[in-house]
Amino acid sequence: MNNILSEEVLNVTDFTTSRQLTLWKREDLQSSQLDDVAEEVPVALVYNGISHVVMMASPKDLTHFAMGFSLSEGIIDSPREIYGMDVVPSCNGLEVQIDLSSRRFMGLKARRRALAGRTGCGVCGVEQLNDIGKPVQPLPFSQTFNLGNLDRALKHLNDFQPTGKLTGCTHAAAWVMPSGELAGGHEDVGRHVALDKLLGRRATEGEEWRQGAALVSSRASYEMVQKSAMCGVEILFAVSAATTLAVDVAERCNLTLVGFCKPGRATIYTHPQRLIAD
């Protein structure tokens, strides 16, 4: 297997396709021209030779995605339980081939047996209703964030959406340092995938990524809250709103959930004690 974080560095245009489109403007006649459209491909996560899940995603930063998904879905507890990854083409998309520890692979196979024979998928990957919104353990209260620094993060969030700037078709997830500086970020056509990419990268970065908060360009659904909590993120900022279930899960797992983040304002849904207001 290749090194866990090995992936070819590509240009942003590698993740878009030019298509002949018809544009309409009130003041003009219809016209046909080339425009950029974001790539979306099926990505299979294959653990020790067995395909576990197929997700639709942007075809970049896929090792980060696989790491984040494995952590946020409870397949692993530590990056050390993945020994290596390869991203390879398949007939209809891409595969991330993951070399998983034997102990974790046995647990994954047990989960697959528990799901076998069931039909329907209201909440994919959840085995029973009681499992919804139940993180491994409540989060500690070890982080604080000065809301006066949020404006800086919001100003630069688009810097991590180069494909989005071309196509208007991606979500972003970024890691906000206590100063408001963005340490890094990822984009994807899927908001959950963008967050998984960020969580996977955070798990393999240094100690400086332990402090701060996650910022997403989308709404905050319960899955976003649960994924964050599973990876030890104590504060989640969302540009859009939160759902009722997201608020309930955040309250239960001690996560500070903040929505409608705009310059100079925000809506704090849960656990405001982590936040400092100048």
UniProtKB/Swiss-Prot annotation:
Does the entry feature the keyword Cytoplasm, yes or no?
yes
Pfam families xref list: FdhD-NarQ
Active-site residues, as the UniProt record annotates them = 121 (cysteine persulfide intermediate)
Q: Name one GO biological process term.
A: Mo-molybdopterin cofactor biosynthetic process
What is the superkingdom listed in this entry's lineage?
Answer: Bacteria
Could you tell me which InterPro entries the record lists for this protein? Cytidine_deaminase-like, FdhD
Q: Which GO terms describe its molecular function?
A: sulfur carrier activity; sulfurtransferase activity
Where Mo-bis(molybdopterin guanine dinucleotide) binds, per the record, is at 260-265
Cellular location(s): Cytoplasm
List keywords of the entry alphabetically. Answer: Cytoplasm, Molybdenum cofactor biosynthesis
Q: Which GO terms describe its cellular component?
A: cytoplasm
Query: Record's Gene3D superfamilies?
Result: 3.10.20.10, Cytidine Deaminase, domain 2
What job does the chain carry out? Answer: Required for formate dehydrogenase (FDH) activity. Acts as a sulfur carrier protein that transfers sulfur from IscS to the molybdenum cofactor prior to its insertion into FDH.
Family, as annotated? Belongs to the FdhD family.
Protein name per Swiss-Prot or TrEMBL: Sulfur carrier protein FdhD
